From Swiss-Prot:
The mature protein consists of high- and low-kDa subunits linked by disulfide bonds. PANTHER family: ASPARTYL PROTEASE-RELATED, BASIC 7S GLOBULIN. Residues 1-24 form the signal peptide. InterPro entries: Aspartic_peptidase_A1 (IPR001461), PEPTIDASE_A1 (IPR033121), Peptidase_aspartic_dom_sf (IPR021109), TAXi_C (IPR032799), TAXi_N (IPR032861), Xylanase_inhibitor_I-like (IPR033868). Belongs to the peptidase A1 family. SUPFAM superfamilies: Acid proteases. It comes from the Eukaryota. Disulfide bonds: none annotated. GO terms for molecular function: aspartic-type endopeptidase activity; identical protein binding; nutrient reservoir activity. This is Basic 7S globulin. GO terms for biological process: proteolysis. The keyword Disulfide bond applies.
Amino acid sequence: MASILHYFLALSLSCSFLFFLSDSVTPTKPINLVVLPVQNDGSTGLHWANLQKRTPLMQVPVLVDLNGNHLWVNCEQQYSSKTYQAPFCHSTQCSRANTHQCLSCPAASRPGCHKNTCGLMSTNPITQQTGLGELGEDVLAIHATQGSTQQLGPLVTVPQFLFSCAPSFLVQKGLPRNTQGVAGLGHAPISLPNQLASHFGLQRQFTTCLSRYPTSKGAIIFGDAPNNMRQFQNQDIFHDLAFTPLTITLQGEYNVRVNSIRINQHSVFPLNKISSTIVGSTSGGTMISTSTPHMVLQQSVYQAFTQVFAQQLPKQAQVKSVAPFGLCFNSNKINAYPSVDLVMDKPNGPVWRISGEDLMVQAQPGVTCLGVMNGGMQPRAEITLGARQLEENLVVFDLARSRVGFSTSSLHSHGVKCADLFNFANA
């Protein structure tokens, strides 16, 4: 009798697996790149994506967090999948996720609630709330592409993608509406880039091209995009990449170093002259983040920055500031805003240019504000480059060689938007 039950159980699992395979295909060529379409949330300025997960596959909307350690989703409501598993405590999967905490849930078994599993701490990057959840594994599917075409390829799968089933309170504040979790792109072992690179044999590298416009999509491209997507509409959109060293903080955050700031070629000051009050910070430490929409500056940097910026524009154009911004203008009295140059790494290092358009925010009809925030005396970094500074720009995170590449000219100068890179119609 036991052998008969075992036979029917095996047959059932095989049928489930075959049903799952019908939603995806096995590629006939080596996979060079995989692509995650990403959207701009108009109400928050943050970016989110629909991940294809579970069996049968369904779309799960998640916030994109550049510095997140792993993927976490809310499993407490309507998580249904034929392929979900919870690895046992002290298993290989738990070691890979760098967690040695055992967790047992006394309620009936369901995704996120099992006995003798691994506990994994997840963080809402907007509210900084944390919550302990169950380490789980389930199917994840993502679009493959060869890079030589704008068409998104078929869905390819990671059958046992590791993630956290986080408590539901983590999604209740701060995230874009209807999102059910966070996709971490950080440096941790089970982050999205590291698991995809390991499973598909990709280079440990990903490129962001975030759309500025809520009505169109951008993309995160995993793999060596600069060498596989060079020819786009008969032009090399990666030809002007400049690179700067990438460091990882103790918290696992992506950091680069800014040596100095210039506004319309007027020097703000070299950052190594700042007496930093940030614990554990090195002078010029700059975090790159998608969990804040705007640039954030340590207070002394902010004060000098806004002073020099205001000096480049007619004083009579200034108007009363609109919270949360500190410097605002009558947009009808200004034709163009000054550009900002971040001199990277060393005095003669490459220049990351941010156009005036990329810094300004329309706060009210006829009122435009400098989208730079005062981070106080002890922010997480002296400078934080927010999502808006990454938009409509190719930014390459080369984890294998510990460097970040950025375009020294905007995509707009090529007549291209992030939405043009792929045909997102069916994504």
